[in-house]
Amino acid sequence: FEKFGLYAGEAFRNQGFAAGAVGGFMETARKVDLAWEPIPIIRGWAGASGPLTDETLAHFVGTITNALKRADQVDALYLDLHGAAVAYSHSDCEGHLLQACRDVLGDSIPIVLALDHHANLTHAMVEHCDALVAHRTQPHNPWETGQLAATLLFNILLGKLTPTIAWKKIPLITHQEQFLTSPAGPMREWFELAREIESLTGVASASTFPMQPWIDVPEGGWAVAVVTNNDMALAEKHANRLAQFAWDQRDRFLLQESIPPADAIRRALESDNGLVILSDTGDSVFGGAPGDSTILLKEMIRQKVQQPVLLTMVDPEVVQQAIVAGIGSTIQVELGGKQSGSYSTPVRLMVQVSAIGGGEIQAACIGRDTFSAGRAVVLTLGSIQIVVSETYGVGGNHPATYDHFGIDPSNAKMIVLKTASNFQYYADWTSQIIRVDTQGATMSDISGFNWQQLP
């Protein structure tokens, strides 16, 4: 959290009030004709990874509940949460936090949630909040989510909304390949149905939750939630509509379009013009993978790729080795594959150290203005340029990763992105997107995981 952005109190006000769902919330809230004052408590952001330690979870819960206890007056609580956090001792971190907040505030103080649409909605989360709203699109648009959350919260305070929530779990999880709402497809249709429902009289919000598929928890699964103005029958009716649509379209949601690495590289090489995006689906850093898979790099070497290629790799050991050697040096490295378990292994290469940099990189990405790559270097292997960093940052999924080193992404033939859905930052140059069926912690073949708790 400290690496990606952890701010408390006034530091949160100064650093976190202008971005993401909190920024959208504040923009709308400032326009409300009501005297009020925000009490910033804490903002913690971290990329997807393994479970939270119990100490980390206790820190956040304690910080928030202690702030609520110290406050002279609390009229409402706004929480901007992802919704799929897991700790070693808690399979539902958000539900645990909400219950703790409710224990402090009592039942009369409204709690409103802004959630990522990849949240795992649970009984505890719904029971201990008054209203909720999820992201409206994929790629994410957290600003709009925060705006609607503010509308819900202040309508409650002004007596314009008596929130009533109906929600449904759907016995379904799918891979990530059909998660986008930007092209035509089942996810777009599902989200558009929610917007249609949301436009109806008496409906305050309608949210769809295609849960991120890499958490093995007892209440796991897709969900929907509808908030109405004191009309449970209306909420139930439309929650059922949304749930039934997802279930009826499950075969379309399960359609897998990714192809084997060898075929993907060949198809990219056969492309006549423009940039080809290779989506490394098994090593998606936004889904919790380590960002150090060597599968596609090895295949490029095997096929003797001569066209310009850009990719990223997380490997602190190689970063240190390259920095010690210095710019212009040629070094032998054992690159990548150190955190991928059995999915990927290091590759031995002779490379040139072309640049050294890193640190905080400016990029408006996934609700943030900057990201940290730690120390980073550029290694050159023939026509392939590899940005190797200590942390994954955004995994090369934003051009700023390359701009930082003076590399123009538009000149590349292929760029490997460590995501299965966040391609939008390269849209101006992209001629083709190829999803690659790579093995890894976020691979599309979710049937290959050892599920133990999922219902």
What label would you give each PLM region?
Residues 150, 155-195:
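Conserved anion/nucleotide-ligand pocket segment
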Residues 36-39, 75-77, 109-113, 130-133, ...:
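Structural motif
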Residues 50-53, 89-91, 122-127, 144-145, ...:
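Short acidic, glycine/serine/threonine-rich loops at helix termini
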Residues 1-67, 221, 225, 232, ...:
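N-terminal glycine-rich anion-binding loop in soluble enzyme alpha/beta folds
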Residues 31-36, 40, 66-75, 265-276:
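Glycine-rich phosphate/diphosphate-binding loops that line cofactor/substrate pockets in enzymes
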Residues 247-250, 360-455:
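Extended hydrophobic packing segments that form well-structured cores
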Residues 178-382, 387-391:
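Hard-cation-handling environments
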Residues 4-5, 52-61, 69-162, 280-297, ...:
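Active-site histidine-anchored catalytic micro-motif
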